[in-house]
Swiss-Prot record:
SUPFAM superfamilies xrefs: N-terminal nucleophile aminohydrolases (Ntn hydrolases), SIS domain
Protein role: Catalyzes the first step in hexosamine metabolism, converting fructose-6P into glucosamine-6P using glutamine as a nitrogen source.
Protein name: Glutamine--fructose-6-phosphate aminotransferase [isomerizing]
Organism of this sequence: Corynebacterium diphtheriae (strain ATCC 700971 / NCTC 13129 / Biotype gravis)
PROSITE patterns documented for this protein: GATASE_TYPE_2, SIS
Taxonomic lineage from the root: Bacteria, Bacillati, Actinomycetota, Actinomycetes, Mycobacteriales
Entry EC no(s): 2.6.1.16
Keyword rRNA processing tagged: no
Positions of the Glutamine amidotransferase type-2 domain: 2-229
Catalytic activity, reaction form: D-fructose 6-phosphate + L-glutamine = D-glucosamine 6-phosphate + L-glutamate
TM helices/strands, residue ranges: none
Length: 625
């Protein structure tokens, strides 16, 4: 939620044909996927701060800049805002400019004590023109800059942050310190980009990936001052601190659409590579599974007596899939918790509990808070994450990175498959370590996992046109139901979520066994129902029961869309539409059956003319509670 960009460069660099405004606007475009409702920029030039801001998309801001240009500069900041305090208006957009027009501030997060601070600042004679907590933070910073910090912007930021409560990232520039940006972070993302004769700040590396792949992750409660020649990090008290350098593993081209109409469509097609890259490098020369990233003592992992998977949204459904596999392979009781519920229900967690978190961005605030709570109770935490340099891996005991590459579309696709793959690897590793499975059994499952990338490609090649046609035909549906059993149940939940997110229509996923306990009342003539059918080569009773469920809804007038593996003839008599996927063991099926549901949701949204990559009201990275 919200995107932040900062740039400082030398005034004269050979062969450089861009200025601060170019860098900042490009960074904001790269960060659009995070979700926003207004945008703004500010630069320091000729001893003054110049700024523009506009409700709406970055394109609206660019149109404003065409009619009202800003001066060239080598220092600037930019922001895309997701409204929390105050509506999405020009006045509430960032940057907020105070101190007689000399100080510009952008902010991501929520200042929880802003009302108290605002009252105090009103007492000092300051006035406010917006409804935002950001203007309060900016005014406090300006007040301290002039009255307590001897006009030292870094010191003023340190003193300001000591007064603020909540989660925030702040970037500030001042006309009287025209060579630097000062930034702070607490429980909100901020990454430093390191160039030659220029340096950058961003909510994530997408904000500066066009210019450098060298980055530095900051810790919590830190402040950084960047100039053209370097950066310096302190804590909020002014003590010297260090960041952790890393190199971004992908380039700007990976964050382009690459010929596809939508980022989501591209990312659906990148899923074979996402699974393959998540598997890569996690086996020794003999083929044995080795997870070197798990910096947790083996004796500790052997003593685990409970696993809790913590996540939100799509990642939580990946966790539900993983639960079936982990319990089956490891024989360890496994729970799946929504992060925002976990913290508030007094969960039973101790030193024999292993917490596994799933987060694509690594910045999901509810999940981050759950990590801290779990560790306070003595649990070990393993993060499964797609973003290097993010907060959740840094605060966990170990991390398995999914290596899925940048996921730009708000609705998650390839991260979901990569998360399932990574949790499967973790489950197999624990089973191997604890002696729950023989080596040949582990190798057999790994062999099946290695076939998944090609099978996902086969799904894409085999059913994409069929599913897109179905989506076009069903674009006027007002409600769609999804049914599944066993691992097909969380797939049904994910299919429903995708349709809600993208097509803005009622969609619900149910455990098929619950039909007669209530949901069957929703079935009427013409009701579309997707059914995920388990392999007939698995538990016969499971397959037979799902076929029976198809018969039940079909008999009541439902339009049945069945996802079944090749060769499963039992469904043909009861399906209006059959989407065929390659044969795979039951636990592998979610990695295949999910793909047509992603294509369907994308197709319905496109047919309705909706923004596929940036659905209304949604943000890619939910960085506030």
């Amino acid at each position: 939620m919200c995107g932040i960009v900062g740039f400082v460069g030398r005034t004269s660099v050979p062969d450089r044909d861009y200025f601060a405004l170019d860098v900042v606007l490009e960074g904001l475009r790269r960060l659009e996927y995070r979700g926003y409702d207004s945008a703004g920029v500010a630069v320091v030039a000729d001893g003054a701060v110049s700024f523009r801001k506009k409700a709406g998309k970055v394109q609206a801001l660019e149109q404003e800049l065409e009619t009202s240009p800003m001066p060239q500069s080598c220092l600037g900041i930019g922001h895309t805002r997701w409204a929390t305090h105050g509506g999405p208006t020009d006045a509430n957009a960032h940057p907020h400019v105070v101190d007689g027009g000399k100080l510009a501030v952008v902010h991501n997060g929520i200042i929880e004590n802003f009302a108290e601070l605002k009252s105090e600042l009103l007492g000092f004679g300051h006035n406010f023109v917006s409804e935002t907590d950001t203007e309060v933070a900016a005014t406090l910073l300006g007040h301290i800059f002039n009255n307590e910090a001897n006009k030292d912007l870094t010191r003023a930021m340190q003193l300001t942050c000591q007064r603020l409560e909540g989660a925030f990232t702040l970037l500030a520039i001042h006309a009287e310190t025209p060579d630097r940006i000062v930034a702070a972070r607490r429980n909100s993302p901020l990454v430093i980009g390191v160039g030659e004769g220029e340096n950058f700040l961003g909510s994530d590396v997408s904000g500066f990936i066009d210019y450098t792949k060298n980055a530095v992750e900051m810790d919590n409660d830190q402040i950084v001052t960047i100039t053209a020649d370097g950066y310096h990090i302190t804590d909020f008290q002014g003590n010297h601190a260090e960041g952790k350098p890393f190199v971004v593993e992908w380039d700007a081209q990976a964050a382009e659409k690459g010929g596809y109409e939508f980022f989501m469509e591209k990312e659906i097609h990148e899923q074979p590579a996402a699974v393959r890259d998540t598997l890569m490098g996690r086996f020794d020369e003999s083929g044995k599974l080795t997870l070197d990233e798990l910096r947790i003592d083996e004796s500790t992992l052997r003593s685990i007596d409970k696993i809790i998977v913590i996540a939100c949204g799509t990642a939580a459904y990946a966790g539900h899939v993983a639960r079936y596999a982990i319990e089956h392979w490891c024989r360890i009781p496994t729970e799946v918790e929504l992060a925002h519920e976990f913290r508030y229900r007094d969960p039973i967690v101790n030193e024999k509990t292993l917490v596994v978190t799933l987060s694509q961005s690594g910045e999901t605030m509810d999940t981050l808070m759950a990590v801290r709570h779990a560790r306070e109770q003595g649990a070990k935490v393993i993060a499964i994450c797609n973003t290097n340099g993010s907060s959740i891996p840094r605060e966990s005991d170990a991390c398995l990175y999914t290596h899925a590459g940048p996921e730009i579309a708000v609705a998650s696709t390839k991260a979901f498959l990569a998360q399932i793959t990574a949790t499967y690897l973790l489950g197999l590793y624990l089973a191997q370590l604890r002696g729950n499975m023989f080596a040949d059994e582990v190798n057999a499952v790994l062999g099946e996992l290695r076939t998944i990338p090609d099978k996902v490609s086969a799904v894409l090649d085999g059913v994409e046109d069929q599913v897109k046609t179905l989506a076009q035909d069903m674009k006027d549906a007002t409600s769609v139901l999804f049914l599944g059993r066993h691992v097909g149940f969380p797939v049904a939940l994910e299919g429903a979520l995708k349709l809600k997110e993208l097509a803005y229509l009622h969609a619900e996923g149910f455990a098929a066994g619950e039909l007669k306990h209530g949901p069957i009342a929703l079935i009427e003539e013409g009701q579309p129902v997707f059914v995920i059918v388990p392999s007939p080569r698995g538990r016969d009773s499971l397959h037979a029961k799902v076929v029976s469920n198809i018969q039940e809804v079909r008999a009541r007038g439902a339009i049945t869309i069945v996802i079944a593996e090749e060769g499963d003839d039992a469904v043909e008599a009861y399906a209006n539409h059959i989407i065929r996927i390659p044969q795979a063991p039951t636990l592998m099926q979610p990695l295949l059956a999910t793909v047509p549901l992603q294509i369907f949701a994308c197709g319905v949204a496109a047919a309705k003319g909706f923004d596929v990559d940036q659905p209304r009201n949604l943000a890619k990275s939910v960085t506030v509670e």
